[in-house]
Amino acid sequence: MMKTRSNPSLLWAVGVGCAVALGLATPAPLAAQEAGLPVCAECHAETVAAFAVTKHGSKLDATGQICQACHGDAAAHLDDPEGAKPPHVFGDAMTAGAKTAVCQSCHDGNRQLAFWESGKHRKNEVACSDCHSIHGKRAEPSITPYLTTQRKLEYETCGECHKSIRAQLNKTSHHPILEGKVACSDCHNPHGALSPAMVKEESTNQLCWSCHTDKRGPFVWSHMPVEENCLSCHNSHGSNVPKLLTVKVPQLCQDCHGSAHGQYAYGSSFAVGGANQNNASRFDARSCVNCHQLIHGSNAPASRGLFLVR
């Protein structure tokens, strides 16, 4: 049988946190340091209990040194808890740059931070602690142990600043972000990227094709707007038009193809070889894609492919 090894400090912190939450215990006085209990937990038991189940907290030790790694030398604070604060309290008086510098003292070599200096978040005074809950989520239990943020709630974190985009997620056609199948970080690198919207790929199309591989091509007959930018026709975050289109068909098609079938008024019927006069032959609704179905590109021979028809 495999033997497991427990972390006494971790078990103690979790136990104290539960006791405090139930009203069965109160933080021990400072003199309890002599008993070897975690120093910071004597006053901050609830915070330590939440912190203990994060990735940072897995390095918790009985001396409280892990706390000083971020908050700085706490000697003066221990001597006078009410009158002296640690050097770094991460409050409003501390600049975003100063907060981030503390995190970078350990995470500076992280490859995800390679473009942090050129990213929009840094330029807009966003600090690591604005997005990451360093002490853990105390209001809700962590879905996966040792994570400082929860993937399920990621869109809510981003939505605190990006409110207009958060609203688009409630539209009838949207990426399954609310359903938990797609996360903001699947497309964007919040720590910085070379692209304007901090997308993970070099271009919007490269990003979209990473999932929608059937639209990549190459095709014998290409639809040039598709090759240029998927966002020419689609709104990536949400739309009230099916398939995330920016506007309805045929208006969307007419933005470029204004002269196509110009002899027919909108809503009128027109003859289609071998077809009856029904909704399939009316110049409205899905009329364009009833015939031109291969709008992302076609490998059909001769002129059928040229016009992207099925």
Features from the language model and the residues they span:
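Short sequence/structural segments immediately N-terminal
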Residues: A28-R310
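Bacterial N-terminal signal peptides
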Residues: W12-A25
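N-terminal secretory signal peptides that target proteins for export/translocation
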Residues: M1-L10
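Intrinsically disordered, low-complexity proline-rich regions
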Residues: M1, G15-C18, H56-K59
